[in-house]
Amino acid sequence: MSTLPQKAPGSLSQAYQLLALVALSGELPASQLSRLAGGTSYKENVVKSLKRQRLLLSYYKNGLRGYRLTAAAKKLLLEHNPERFSFYLSGACATNHIRSEPEQRLRLHRVSQTLITMRNANVSIFRDEKPGVFRPGETAIGSICTPAFYTSREIKETGTTFVKIRGARSVGVLLTPQHIHVVYNMGNALMKWSYKAEMRTKALMQTVLCRERMPHQYHPDAVRGLLLGDSMELAYELLTDQGGKNYFVLDGSYERFCFLTNDHHGEVLLRLLCDEELDNDLRELLLLDLEPRQLSETVENDAMTPDGAPVLLAYDCDLPRIRRFDTALRLQDRYGILICFDHQVEVLRRYCGDRAVVQAIDFAAFERRFFP
């Protein structure tokens, strides 16, 4: 029988990073192991080693497989960095005492998947790396200088106001220096949607962050929506309302609601979304040979062609803007130009049909230039 280690793995090691991610979410879906840094065989060996040391265990039930921490792993992490882990590994919280119902586990899996997307996009996820924006009694919050993600459990620290929101589907909030993004993760299927619950979530963000805790940084208009999903096909289903009224996400809850995939494409675009300067550089590059934006136009646009066709930059996959653009073209029997990344082209071309010419940005070339 292997003996228990006396201390946690080094904080820079893959083993530590894996244990830390499991700690924050409660259960990491086995399918997400491929998204962590390192080769496949190396990561498999890391998992085997942690199991041998009795720090990690596999849990399989109802067709769901995930990784959970053992009591020994929790003890080591708490001893190593209590500021980082005590919130998740103490008491009867959902990440410490995990329920076995499929729906509860799926929510933990969606949170875990979101944390990986954020971490891979260089967004701060650990409590000792970001301001205590939602901590009760916090008086000196300061400003958000670098992107930081707070899970829905962290948000509920504020008090009973957030706890009382029933039916809200958000997994957390991403704070950048300029914006507040309420984050939703659909995973591999459309999710049920409650307009009233999500409007309450948005209103509370505006009250707690924009008016009470951080009015020096955020205006109420800074609150946006960010939607994560496993494939661009989900974006098509949302744009075409295939889920019916119970899945009607694009109901006006958020004027800006970007869709990103839970993969390398989405992680890179998330980095762009969090960096206003880089985003402006890309916009300027794409609009070089076009006429200026026309605010008086009846079709939403970012620029105009010399012959008067509206142009929409859709690389951020802002679904409400794309739908408004397409609807206006259809109603006015006009054509326009939509610019997006190559991995988004097929879905957006299928959605717009012959109403829009969809032009592709080479994603690989973009990444080499903007994130060398």
Protein language model features and the residues they cover:
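Exposed, interaction-prone assembly regions rather than primary DNA-binding/catalytic cores
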Residues: 95-195
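General detector of folded, globular domains
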Residues: 72-82, 88-91, 101-119, 171-173, ...
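Short small/polar-residue motifs
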Residues: 51-55, 165-171, 295-300
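A general structural signal for short secondary-structure junctions and capping/turn motifs
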Residues: 48, 173, 214-218
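Long, compositionally biased intrinsically disordered regions
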Residues: 183-192, 197-372
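Short secondary-structure junctions
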Residues: 54-58, 123-128, 284-285, 292
